[in-house]
């Protein structure tokens, strides 16, 4: 007994790390490994090839592909339809999102012929699902990536940018940034764990104080967050967060977050969804968490069709897209429309400007 105790003391950290590793392995039982996830994504692509395509937006530090599932009746084609994305596993130790997003994809595939909501999404939206943004962090059972960087603090920030050069970012961050530069998303949500609330911009304040800091589209973001919370089993009943929603800066300010970057740099309305009180619950809780969040995920994506403006502007003579811009009155927002437009700003007055046409003021 004494010998064993001395042996453990001499080993010090390695004994503790081995014990921690075993605990982490036990916690991960029932969850997909990165290899399992890749197989599941590719199997989905084969099984549901008529309404999907599989692609990668890049690789993690350790070279793991960041797989995306696109769901649409015309996957990979450019259409005058809005695009929405879900991003899971931003933090490696918050894996519920990666499990739920695969279930979401499979549920839509299994039900889009017989379920009106699934059919609405397939026929009217391009839904993109990135189950795991941080596969290395998941493998290491920790929040940060392989370089131990918190990816949700790694994006250029409006107040405290460390470096706005995309090349200075982590590979996973760069992949997401390039993704949004190549593709136009109207809405988005990232899935996290450790609380139960739908969080919306702004996430930070200029003076770093904790208070409500509204973005120009505060009403629309509150509407989106409420769709999620009120479609959820019990999120809207929260005693900590009225209605199950919160302004990020009021909860706790963060800087370098993906949510604010989406809104500022890509015109994409992103929520941060905390979907489980426990960051890494036992795997036997996943079916219940899926049932609690299923309608919220579906209704949030479907809200793009039920609200907002989306389409393209063509010349009636040539059929070619026309260059122009859209301005929303009362909001400091101008969007180029040559490649199509998806706008998700609630009830507003829209002004369309086409430089090739003298009378180009249109209100909608």
Label every PLM stretch briefly.
Residues 322-349:
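Short, acidic Ser/Thr/Gly-rich low-complexity loop/linker segments typical of extracellular
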Residues 309-316:
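A short, amphipathic beta-strand motif
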Residues 55, 241-264:
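Short, Gly/Ser/Thr-enriched beta-strand-loop segments that form substrate-interacting elements
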Residues 10-65:
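Short glycine- and acidic-rich boundary segments immediately preceding or forming the N-terminal edge
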Residues 78-226, 230-239, 262-263, 270-275:
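Active-site/substrate-binding loop(s) of hydrolase catalytic cores
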Residues 350-364:
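A short, solvent-exposed loop/turn motif at the edges and junctions
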Residues 66-76, 258-264:
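Short, surface-exposed beta-strand/loop micro-motifs that present aromatic residues
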Residues 281, 286-308:
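Beta-strand-rich domain onsets/edges
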């Amino acid at each position: 007994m004494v010998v064993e105790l001395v042996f453990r003391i001499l080993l010090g950290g390695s004994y503790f790390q081995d014990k921690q590793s075993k605990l982490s392995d036990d916690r991960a039982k029932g969850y997909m490994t990165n290899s399992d996830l890749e197989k599941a994504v590719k199997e989905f692509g084969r099984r549901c090839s008529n309404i999907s395509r599989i692609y990668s937006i890049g690789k993690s530090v350790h070279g793991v592909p960041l797989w995306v599932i696109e769901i649409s009746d015309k996957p990979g084609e450019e259409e005058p339809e809005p695009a929405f994305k879900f991003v899971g596993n931003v933090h490696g130790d918050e894996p519920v999102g990666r499990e739920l997003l695969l279930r979401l994809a499979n549920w839509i595939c299994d039900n889009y012929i017989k379920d009106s909501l699934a059919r609405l999404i397939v026929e009217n939206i391009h839904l993109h699902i990135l189950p795991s943004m941080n596969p290395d962090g998941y493998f290491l059972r920790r929040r940060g990536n392989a370089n131990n960087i918190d990816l949700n603090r790694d994006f250029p920030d409006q107040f405290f940018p460390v470096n706005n050069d995309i090349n200075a970012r982590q590979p996973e961050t760069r992949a997401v940034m390039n993704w949004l530069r190549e593709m136009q998303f109207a809405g988005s949500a990232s899935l996290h764990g450790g609380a139960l609330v739908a969080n919306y911009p702004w996430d930070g304040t200029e003076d770093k104080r904790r208070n409500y800091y509204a973005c120009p589209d505060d009403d629309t973001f509150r509407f989106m967050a409420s769709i999620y919370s009120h479609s959820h089993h019990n999120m809207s009943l929260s005693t900590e967060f009225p209605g199950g929603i919160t302004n990020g800066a009021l909860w706790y300010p963060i800087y370098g977050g993906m949510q604010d970057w989406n809104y500022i740099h890509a015109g994409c309305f992103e929520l941060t969804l905390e979907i489980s009180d426990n960051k890494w619950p036992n795997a036997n809780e996943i079916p219940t968490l899926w049932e609690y969040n299923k309608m919220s995920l579906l209704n949030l994506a479907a809200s793009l069709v039920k609200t907002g403006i989306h389409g393209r502007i063509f010349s009636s003579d040539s059929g070619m897209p026309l260059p122009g811009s859209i301005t929303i009155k009362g909001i400091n927002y101008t969007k180029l429309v040559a490649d199509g437009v998806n706008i998700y700003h609630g009830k507003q007055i829209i002004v369309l400007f086409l430089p090739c046409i003298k009378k180009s003021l249109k209100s909608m």
